[in-house]
Amino acid sequence: YAVAADAPAAAALAGNLYEFSLTHGYDAVSGGLHDEVTACGDVYRDDRRLWPQTEALKAHVARLQDAGDDAARSRLEVGIESLFRYHLMGPPGGWREHINSDGENFYGSYPASTLYHLASAVGELERISDVR
């Protein structure tokens, strides 16, 4: 949005939120994004839903492409690997929607909205595939 609308204030805010999430939102072991952190940066829920992982991938793409953040490339690779290792496994055509801090699935259903998030992330990754 910030680039399309030529809105530097939005770009600055997005950059601050991105940096906050990098500092406080990630599980160092899995490379996945925690469900919730407080405004002070403390982990409130260390479970991990699938859809925020896809949103994180899209944020890394935006940082790489629009903010010139070359370090976002390695974050993107870690995020993709974490997504496949912890969420895109199990029965063919299925996924692990919500996992605990040990990486165990505890959510039994497969929300259809997850397909939207996966497709959006894949679309962004495909769009920049020539950048990689």
Please state what every model-predicted region is:
Residues 1-132:
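Glycan-recognition and catalytic cores of secretory/periplasmic carbohydrate-active enzymes
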